[in-house]
């Protein structure tokens, strides 16, 4: 009887088609685990964030103290806060690995799914940015000041736009209050878009490592991949709890233990590690507007990837030339992340500029050209 309810009940039927009887390619590897891991990350972040919001006060005179209160006086508040802060880092690790898998195996050819994914990345970055401002430490305040100030680069409307976002003439109480509102609201928008992301994915079915049609060889999602995902859940929770319990401040900035002071500028203003690659690209261009446009394009360039696909094969698995350039792109992104955390001086300036040019060249010119060359080599045989 339970089987029939699962397949006939209007609500359970949707869940059944998405999680139980979903036809999945039999050869999808460990790299396909990250979608479900991102779902788990989102649930963890929403739940821990909800408990933090119960004790947090969005006021410049009390924000820092309320975070201290959470860590000292609230039952397991220190744990909730550490899981939330490090959960964000793990979220971005999973996102970047998920995107890398999509680029390597050609999953971007599901254009609707891919483009919604890019919008999700942008929303995730916005959520993380406004969330980083909430503890109201030195790096929170100055990070908010520097990054929001970039909008002043836009001609004519720039200054008005910045003051509109600030809610005044500087980052102050109005800014903190609205950033808290955005930080509370955006995860639910991410949740809604995730459902649409899955909806489009289930219209086409999952890609597979070979990048070929797998309709002839599908197996049900449960029990095969549900248990495989469960293993991933346990591994990720192990890493998250290890990080939160033993090294909670490893990925944070020491400056944020100092309450925000508008009169004292930190020696080196930098965002969290997951934004450093984009921050390095921003800093590598001497022009302010050019830097802002490059920063935005460093993320939205992912939307051009399906249009720049010139290969006759979908996956990179049998394309050694493109594989080399893919791993060069990965190495280049790691170099950009490192450069973003360094002071603005030689040789870091030059390395950052070379890495930024390489980043865009690999996406726009080198990888499409490598694919075209591979097509020519294949046609010779």
From Swiss-Prot:
Signal peptide: none
Cellular component GO terms held in the UniProt record: mitochondrial inner membrane; respiratory chain complex III
Highest taxon, organism lineage: Eukaryota
A Gene Ontology biological process term: mitochondrial electron transport, ubiquinol to cytochrome c
Cofactor: record remark: Binds 2 heme b groups non-covalently.
Cofactor(s) it depends on: heme b
Membrane topology qualifier: Multi-pass membrane protein
Described function: Component of the ubiquinol-cytochrome c reductase complex (complex III or cytochrome b-c1 complex) that is part of the mitochondrial respiratory chain. The b-c1 complex mediates electron transfer from ubiquinol to cytochrome c. Contributes to the generation of a proton gradient across the mitochondrial membrane that is then used for ATP synthesis.
Other facts: Heme 1 (or BL or b562) is low-potential and absorbs at about 562 nm, and heme 2 (or BH or b566) is high-potential and absorbs at about 566 nm.
Quaternary organization: The cytochrome bc1 complex contains 3 respiratory subunits (MT-CYB, CYC1 and UQCRFS1), 2 core proteins (UQCRC1 and UQCRC2) and probably 6 low-molecular weight proteins.
Similarity comment: family membership: Belongs to the cytochrome b family.
Protein name, per record: Cytochrome b
Organism from which the protein derives: Sphyrna tiburo vespertina (Pacific bonnethead shark)
